[in-house]
Amino acid sequence: MAGQMVHVEIPAGDTAKAREFWGSLFGWQFEEYPGSPTEYHMTRFSETQGGAIMGADGDKRGPRVYFDVDDINTENARVGELGGSSGEAYPVPGMGWFAVCKDSEGNEFGLWQTDPNAPGA
């Protein structure tokens, strides 16, 4: 459903400690996602919603929320038209496409398009 929050990434300097915290707080169970350029541990909240603890990228702190879209290229273009910064769309093999963008105030967020035919790397 377009506009629904579908994923959240929580950066951490110590991913084991963060997984222990969030796992204990909410009962989340994590699986390492292979092939990621950074340490990345995924969890599921529901059939269509999930999240991840990921290695921190420099001084960046705070979660990044991803929103579902019907067409990532169309919505990515709209981000720019509305005064934000659009990002390149990348495939997640067999799952879909994502793009990291910034809103008009510089806040990062992500777009997600489900596509089981998304190509491999």
Predicted regions and their residues:
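Conserved short beta-strand elements that form part of the metal-binding/catalytic scaffold
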Residues: 28-62, 108-114
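Vicinal oxygen chelate
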Residues: 5-13, 31, 57-121
